[in-house]
Amino acid sequence: MAGLQGWQLVIIILLAILLFAAPKLPAMARNLGQSMRIFSSEVKQMRTEGKDAKDERSGTGSTAADEPVEGRVVDRDETDPRDQR
């Protein structure tokens, strides 16, 4: 095989694959197509999740309530023993 070039080896390998794997090629192509559809749907989902996260950070997609929070403010005296350390 000293006289064979790279492109000739590629053609021989492709012919061998077609000869020995011909019955399996439709199933392999179907699986490849299904994998590509799953991959593209996952990429699309990641993009929409990324946009949602960006909206939450910017405040446009905020779900915070407009109602005030109940509680009380506590001011400690300077004489409080818990503040002295």
UniProtKB/Swiss-Prot annotation:
Where are its TM segments located?
A: 1-21
Record's superkingdom? Bacteria
Keyword hit for Transmembrane: yes
The record describes its membrane topology as: Single-pass membrane protein
Instruction: List, as start-end ranges, the regions of compositional bias called Basic and acidic residues.
Output: 44-58, 69-85
Pull one GO CC term from this UniProt entry: TAT protein transport complex
Where is this protein localized, as stated in its record? Cell membrane
Q: Which UniProt keywords apply?
A: Cell membrane, Membrane, Protein transport, Translocation, Transmembrane, Transmembrane helix, Transport
Major localization listed first in the record, in broad terms: membrane
Q: Does the keyword Metal-binding apply?
A: no
The record, for Pfam families, names: TatA_B_E
Checking InterPro entries in the record gives: TatA/B/E, TatA/E
* GO MF, one example: protein transmembrane transporter activity
**Region feature (Disordered):** 43-85
| GO BP term, pick one | protein transport by the Tat complex
How is this protein organized at the quaternary level? The Tat system comprises two distinct complexes: a TatABC complex, containing multiple copies of TatA, TatB and TatC subunits, and a separate TatA complex, containing only TatA subunits. Substrates initially bind to the TatABC complex, which probably triggers association of the separate TatA complex to form the active translocon.
- What the protein does? Part of the twin-arginine translocation (Tat) system that transports large folded proteins containing a characteristic twin-arginine motif in their signal peptide across membranes. TatA could form the protein-conducting channel of the Tat system.
By sequence similarity, the record places it as follows: Belongs to the TatA/E family.
**What protein am I looking at?**
Sec-independent protein translocase protein TatA
Gene source species = Micrococcus luteus (strain ATCC 4698 / DSM 20030 / JCM 1464 / CCM 169 / CCUG 5858 / IAM 1056 / NBRC 3333 / NCIMB 9278 / NCTC 2665 / VKM Ac-2230) (Micrococcus lysodeikticus)
